[in-house]
Design a protein with these regions (language model features):
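Intrinsic-disorder-associated, low-complexity terminal segments enriched in Asp/Asn/His/Tyr and depleted
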Residues: 3-4, 21
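Conserved glycine-rich acetyl-CoA-binding loop
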Residues: 116, 120-134, 143, 148, ...
Length: 216
């Protein structure tokens, strides 16, 4: 897998990337996506997360339901899966939200994973989370040829669960005591085009423990 990218002043330059998985090359040009948010004339840009953003996105993580990690964790994702780490940026270079994920697994378990997706409270209800999720799904589906995308969510986080269901995700299984505080997690999945028979989203009939997870 070859990545040729440039980060200057916190902005990604449009680049050409050649990615090869399963011995199949794909030539893709990754460029920032700009759009007007609903009911607003302000331009929003979704671009790759850059090293400089690590010092600027703290305010987005203030929501108590947002899982946060140490700096080395974010650095690992930025280094290993840069194509799955994007930020939504508004006027004045203000970070509105971000998504962080990866691709992993083998055989029919080859999948994209959403590790974290969050939008700052003042920018919610503008479909930013949907746009970030769609971008990760497109990369998983069209570039990495994954079978599905999955994510974990707290069983008590009803608003997030409903949002994911609207985006086409289903509850695949319950993971007992997955989160701190002994709270259960829900493993939600969305089948991609490669999973023609939708085998990846057939729900399990029993809950599992974190030790039984193949990937997390």
């Amino acid at each position: 897998m070859g990545h040729h990218r440039s980060c200057k002043n916190g902005l990604w330059k449009p680049i050409g990337v050649t990615i090869s998985y399963l011995a199949v090359p794909f030539n893709v040009s990754f460029r920032a996506r700009s759009f007007f948010v609903p009911n607003s004339r302000k331009m929003t840009t979704i671009r790759r997360f850059c090293c400089n953003d690590l010092l600027r996105f703290t305010s987005v993580n203030l929501d108590h339901l947002t899982e946060t990690f140490n700096m080395s964790f974010y650095m690992t994702y930025l280094a290993r899966w840069p194509d799955y780490f994007h930020v939504a940026e508004g006027p004045g270079n203000r970070i509105m939200g971000y998504i962080m994920g990866k691709v992993e697994g083998q055989g029919e378990s080859w999948h994209g994973h959403v590790t974290a997706v969050t939008v700052s409270p003042e920018y919610r209800r503008q479909q930013l989370a949907k746009k970030l999720m769609n971008l990760l799904e497109d990369i998983s589906d069209k570039i990495d040829k994954a079978y599905f995308v999955d994510l974990f969510v707290r069983a008590s986080n009803t608003p997030a669960i409903k949002m994911y269901e609207k985006l086409g995700y289903v509850i695949y299984r319950r993971v007992l005591r997955y989160y701190s505080g002994e709270e259960d997690g829900l493993d939600m999945r969305k089948a991609l085009s490669r999973d023609v028979e939708k085998k990846s989203i057939i729900p399990l009939k029993r809950p599992v423990t974190p030790d039984e997870l193949e990937y997390d």
